[in-house]
Amino acid sequence: NTSVAVPAQIWGAPIIDDDVTFFFNSGLDLGNGSEAYMFGNYSERDIDGGFYFRNPDGRGGVFTKGDGTRLIADVTGDMSGNCPTALDPSDYAGRDAVIADPNCYILNQAAPGGYTPRFIGNITDSSFTMGRSGEIANGMMAGTAYDISGSVGRNEATFGLNNTFNPSMGPDSPRDFETGSYIQLAKTFNVDLSKEYGSTSVAYGYEWRETTFSVISGEEASWKAGPYAVQGFNVGSHGFAGFSPDSAGAFSRRNYAVYGDVSNQVSEDLLVQGALRYENYSSGLDTTNYKLAFNYQLTDDIALRGSHSTGFRAPTQGQANVVNTQTTLVDGQLTQAQTLPGFKLGADQLQPEESTSFAMGIVATLGDVELTADWFNIEVDDRIALTSNAAPTAAQRAAMTAAGIPNAELIGEVNYFTNDFNTETSGLDIVATYSTNLMGGSTDLSAAYNYTDTEVSDQGNVTSDSKVKRLEEGLPNHRATFTMDQQWENVSAFVRANYYGEYYAVHADWFGTNADSAMTVDVEVTYDINESFNVSVGAQNIFDQEAEKIDGSTGAVGEGVPGNVLGAIYYETSPMGIEGAFWYLSAGYNF
């Protein structure tokens, strides 16, 4: 069966081909202290990744019905085929009889051993910025530094799904689908001005921004409801349904902002700063935020610093308008889940996130050691996140139908972006650096430690307990790195040790365990052939430290592999990844 790879399902990073990135940066001296500049980038890559394996005797909506019996299509057009309605998947003689009956059809005829879809895509990113900077020479604004610029950025993700079916099309389904595209376009215009008045520095400016999120529909076969949808077959390219014309469109928003920033050297030892920013959105949102900060030189070698600020993050146009259908795990079972704008399910329109933060720290020079230590606390209210998957209620189905969602009655699970919970994150960052001469060269040693603790202060109405646990425990509280960077005349090298503390590991957004701490080591050596050309060889996780293995809990089908984990060996949320050791060879050329 060519529809099934060996192994049937692969966990890990996708295949990336034709990965190309180009940057440029240029400037032109215009005289009198002014400069024109341009910079930009372009990148493109093809991605090919695996999806969940479709079991030929168990995948609902494809091979079986909701009651577990085999899903059989009557292809006569008038339901006169007298096809079996309660055939057990283990009855292979009955299956073969169905295959031999021209009035009946099962997808096993096209994929007798099941199949594993391949999710493919082409990703392009591009941006371009041009501007002019300098200092105003005459008039009432003489001595004012300026920077005026405009930029445009574009990201396009074109999706496809291969080696799958639109089950509702039965024997007429193609196997490969073009499912559509997302395009994000951003345009900005900035004017930034600043001037010093004795011990006081003043900065102010204006920003205009327009963002457009576009959904391009896929080919018809990727989203259409075929003739067998009414018999229980899933609609659309199975695994990631195409974007229909009903969900396609361009969704734009404009906003402008003005800001002011004042800093004053109150005394030789004390610097204070205050900033204010007002932002207005065409969607009707507006906000005013501020920042207060200080730096106090306690002694020649020790300084204290601190800040307090408020923040605001409006929902993106993508979050507010995204529509897609894909396969996901719900309570350990594969199912089709659709992501919809919340208002199409009768939920409230998305509102902005608001945050308040505090930070306090110390900067010290202790002989040849530079040390910084900062405590921080961040409270975020009305956080924007996807809800857990759940079967739509009758009221939600009615809202979906009223909003024009096609085949609403066939959608098994839904989720949507919503403002539903609040969090409080606090922690400590400590960084120490030391420079010396060792082994006939210059040596930089650095150590960094981070402690971060996140608490869900208000769970809201739709955020599940399991999601709260992932938010609070899904990342290590303790992280640390130690780096040794060595430089000789033509050779440089570094060794870095990475420490990850205990965390709550989750597999496929379904179940988890408390994972042990671990350490990885990265190394790299670079040789400068000349002033322009260099080559590097290195490794990430050189000792091949494994991620946390899935434990042998109830329902285990083998050592370290519980039931229904779809071939996974490691918990996929490991902070160090599940790929193991990665070696690389690279070359660089500086123009």
Where are these predicted regions, by residue range?
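Transmembrane beta-barrel wall of Gram-negative outer-membrane proteins
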Residues: N1-G113, P117-E135, M140-M141, D528
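Outer-membrane beta-barrel proteins
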Residues: N1-G31, I47-F51, C104-D125, D172-T188, ...
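Transmembrane beta-strands of outer-membrane beta-barrel pores
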Residues: V20, Y42-D46, I136, V152-E156, ...
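Repeated loop/turn-to-beta-strand initiation elements of outer-membrane beta-barrel proteins
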Residues: G33-A36, G139-Y146, S199-V202, D269-V272, ...
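Outer-membrane beta-barrel transmembrane domain signature of Gram-negative proteins
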Residues: P117-I123, S127-F128, A137, G150-V152, ...
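Outer-membrane beta-barrel signature, preferentially recognizing the C-terminal barrel domain
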Residues: G239, F243-N255, D301, G311-E379, ...
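Gram-negative outer-membrane beta-barrel transporters
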Residues: F376-A508, S586, N590
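C-terminal beta-signal and adjacent terminal beta-strands/loops
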Residues: V380, Y499-A505, T526-F591
